[in-house]
Curated annotation (Swiss-Prot):
Its EC number is 1.2.1.71. It comes from Pseudomonas fluorescens (strain SBW25). This is N-succinylglutamate 5-semialdehyde dehydrogenase. The lineage of its organism: Bacteria, Pseudomonadati, Pseudomonadota, Gammaproteobacteria, Pseudomonadales. NCBIfam families: arg_catab_astD (TIGR03240), PRK09457.1 (NF006992). The keyword DNA-binding does not apply.
Length: 488
């Protein structure tokens, strides 16, 4: 199978054979070979050769290609949504919104690029001071599996807009979505070599990240892989490295008046996308006492009724599957370990079918566990921690190496202002689901959640660098010479 797209041609990979499966039926959706280090080098050379012509194209011409890509996404929206749903397991209603986000990213990127870059000039003595921006050259984009269309698109679009050429390495769990996305770029008229697709797993990723021919790398994925990349790029200030990683995100609940509103927001924060969003709530901080007991009882009762099913099931489920049987097993094992260490199951997560990666929501009280692991459990497993007072809640919220998202459900604006000020996170929400963020806002965290904000409004800052110039059309001897210099 021709699994790679290099220099405008579809080629068979020469590396390890791998496949993607529908996580519910286990039906094979895609199979092919990954790219070898030699094929990665060929793709880097193709991107390097394509770079000058693409960078010299007028901005409006590049924008035209991007807008045609957006139109192609809209024309093929049903096909793309179904592809995302069957490969990730997320319900169709959610896949449809992902395709919409992909198309909307074009206008957002164009607006931010115009505002953050462009050309500025002013007089400076007998010359003109000019500030312009230039693309970096060849950049790599590593995509995740949870939003295999939208998230890599958030880096590919601004990179191409700025005049860079791109090497796209998608998750090995979602190769079919990546292939379809590249087909849409081809249909939009993107020139050969400007975007190259490198399918593959760990070996392909290592070869691409280590290739000296790339000028930068944009990564979205696990903290473990991101940390490896950071170590690999250590001592390389000539390379751009932007990392968007995970989080052990806290959602603090105050004693609010509308309990059902709190319950609904918690469910949207913890269990949407089967808990496979990097901003999902992992830790639910609930006050001690009768009010907290009542909230948890209501949360458990409602969560137990959440519909879980296949991506195309009708009526549509709220939750689809996790990405794979291996992911499901890891989550079940994590729950078992928590319970063995003294946690209490308020609602035990289950796997109804052994050969389907469908999991029901789990709510585990870990308040009494003395040695809690500070890790991102990427699935529908919510840990409850009871707190004595608001100061203790904030301290517990910050008790993590991560710092991606944090949220507060409270009727008190003063408490939110305190929470916002003292929280260590890149996204802080008040009375809204933790997974909600404006698509125009820069996305990212602090600590082990990553570095930089190479997306949305700030994307242009990482795709083009400023060049300062002093310019004058004529070379003349100044009226006054510097002391100690004579021309006669």
């Amino acid at each position: 199978m021709n699994s790679l797209y290099i220099a405008g041609s579809w080629l068979a990979g020469q590396g390890e054979l791998f496949e993607s499966r529908n996580p519910v039926t286990q039906h094979v959706l895609w199979a092919g070979n990954g790219a070898t280090a030699e094929q990665v080098e060929s793709a880097v050379q193709a991107a390097r050769q394509a770079f000058p012509a693409w960078a010299r194209r007028p901005l409006e011409e590049r924008i035209s290609v991007l807008e045609t890509f957006a139109a192609t996404l809209k024309n093929r929206a049903d096909e793309i949504a179904r592809c995302i749903g069957e490969e990730t397991g997320k319900p169709l209603w959610e896949s449809v919104t992902e395709v919409t986000s992909m198309a909307n990213k074009i206008a957002i990127s164009v607006q931010s690029y115009r505002e953050r870059t462009g050309e500025k000039s002013g007089p400076l003595g007998d010359a003109t001071a000019v500030l312009r921006h230039k693309p970096h050259g060849v950049v790599a984009v590593f995509g995740p599996y949870n939003f295999p269309g939208h998230l890599p698109n958030g880096h590919i679009v601004p990179a191409l807009l700025a005049g860079n050429t791109v090497l796209f390495k998608p998750s090995e769990l979602t190769p079919k979505v990546a292939e379809l996305t590249v087909q849409c770029w081809i249909e939009a008229g993107l020139p050969a070599g400007v975007l190259n697709l490198l399918q593959g797993a760990r070996e392909t990723g290592i070869a691409l990240a280590a290739n000296p021919g790339i000028d930068g790398l944009f990564f979205t994925g696990s903290s473990r892989t991101g940390n490896h990349l950071h170590q690999q790029f250590s001592g390389r200030p000539d390379k751009i490295l932007a990392l968007e990683m995970g989080g052990n995100n806290p959602l603090v609940v105050d004693e609010v008046a509308d309990v059902d509103a709190a319950v609904y927001t918690i469910i949207q924060s913890a269990f949407i996308s089967a808990g496979q969003r990097c901003t999902c709530a992992r830790r639910l901080l609930v006050p001690e006492g009768a009010w907290g007991d009542a909230l948890l009882a209501r949360l458990v009762a409602v969560s137990a009724t959440i519909a879980v099913g296949a991506f195309d099931q009708q009526p549509a489920p709220f939750m689809g599957s996790v990405i794979s049987l291996a992911a499901a097993k890891a989550l079940m094992d994590a729950q078992e370990l928590m319970l063995a260490n003294g946690a209490v199951a308020l609602l035990e997560m289950t796997q109804p079918q052994d050969q389907a990666a469908l999991l029901t929501p789990g709510i585990i009280d870990v308040t009494g566990v003395t040695a809690r692991e500070d890790e991102e459990l990427f699935g529908p497993l919510l840990q409850v921690i009871r707190y004595a007072d608001f100061a203790a809640a904030i301290a517990e919220a910050n008790n993590t190496q991560y710092g991606l998202a944090a949220g507060l459900l409270s009727d008190s604006e003063a408490r939110y202002q305190q929470f916002w000020l003292e929280s260590r996170a890149g996204i802080v929400n008040w009375n809204k689901q933790l997974t909600g963020a404006a698509s125009t806002a820069p996305f990212g965290g602090v600590g082990a959640s990553g570095n930089h904000r190479a997306s949305a409004y700030y994307a242009a800052d990482y795709c083009a660098y400023p060049v300062a110039s002093l310019e004058t059309p004529s070379l003349v001897v100044p009226a006054t010479l510097t002391p100690g210099v004579r021309l006669s």
